[in-house]
Every structure is written in structure tokens, then in C-alpha cells.
């Protein structure tokens, strides 16, 4: 039987600037903060911060997720970030404001939402 190797503690990186990716859907918001090479420094989602079900899609849940990810990134020495926002969700602006409120300096905001050139058929309208 193969012996399990012991993993060492996670090494703290000293990363002064990075990129924050905010993926905001109707059901959840995921905030990932990377270094300039694209290696993940910290991440958080509305679900990982304790929200369940329909509450994950709210702007407040996005704010909490952004604050959590930003706090972890600042522990690794991050000061400046570029923000890439993707998706149509409710938590887009709130997540950006939360990143700014934690003390990170935002140098750039870019919308990278993929727009189809008439690709897949969208879901039908809800009738309640």
C-alpha cells in the first residue's frame, strides 16, 4: 500500500499587486484573486461565506464574498488590484465596492463578460 506523503504548511506569498476576477451569475458570485501570472492567491464565493440557496445570488452575499477574498489577499501582502468582472448577476457592483472598502487600491476595472455572436438559445422566460 502506498504511503501518504505529509504536506507542509501553505507558504505565504508576498504579492504586492494582482488581478481580482468577479464571476457573478444569477445564483452565486465567485471572487478569485490571483497574482499577475494567474496563480490563485485567494478565493471566496457567496456559498463559501455561509449563504445557502437563493440568498447566494444577492448583492449582500457578493459583498461578503469579496471582503473575505480581499482579506486573505491582503494577508499575503496585496495592495493593488485590477478587477475583471464577468456575468450578469446582481453582485457585480457591490463586489467591486467591497474590494475598494477593504483598502485595496483598484487600478483598472474591465468587463470580460462573454457575448455570443448568436450562439446558444437562451433559457425561456419564467412565468410565475
UniProtKB/Swiss-Prot annotation:
PROSITE patterns: RIBOSOMAL_S11 (PS00054). One of its GO terms (biological process) is translation. The keyword Disulfide bond does not apply. SUPFAM superfamilies: Translational machinery components (SSF53137). InterPro entries: Ribosomal_uS11, Ribosomal_uS11_bac-type, Ribosomal_uS11_CS, Ribosomal_uS11_sf. One of its GO terms (molecular function) is rRNA binding. It comes from the Bacteria. Belongs to the universal ribosomal protein uS11 family. Part of the 30S ribosomal subunit. Interacts with proteins S7 and S18. Binds to IF-3. Located on the platform of the 30S subunit, it bridges several disparate RNA helices of the 16S rRNA. Forms part of the Shine-Dalgarno cleft in the 70S ribosome. This is Small ribosomal subunit protein uS11. It comes from Synechococcus sp. (strain JA-3-3Ab) (Cyanobacteria bacterium Yellowstone A-Prime).
Amino acid at each position: 500500500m502506498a504511503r501518504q506523503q505529509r504536506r507542509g504548511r501553505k507558504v505565504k506569498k508576498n504579492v504586492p499587486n494582482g488581478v481580482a476576477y468577479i464571476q457573478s451569475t444569477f445564483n452565486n458570485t465567485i471572487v478569485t484573486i490571483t497574482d499577475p501570472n494567474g496563480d490563485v492567491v485567494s478565493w471566496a464565493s457567496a456559498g463559501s461565506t455561509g449563504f445557502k440557496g437563493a440568498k447566494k445570488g444577492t448583492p449582500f452575499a457578493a459583498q461578503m464574498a469579496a471582503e473575505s477574498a480581499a482579506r486573505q489577499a491582503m494577508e499575503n501582502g496585496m495592495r493593488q488590484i485590477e478587477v475583471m468582472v464577468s456575468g450578469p448577476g446582481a453582485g457585480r457592483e457591490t463586489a467591486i465596492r467591497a474590494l475598494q472598502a477593504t483598502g485595496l487600491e483598484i487600478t483598472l476595472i474591465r468587463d470580460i463578460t462573454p457575448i455570443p455572436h448568436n450562439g446558444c438559445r437562451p433559457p425561456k422566460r419564467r412565468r410565475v
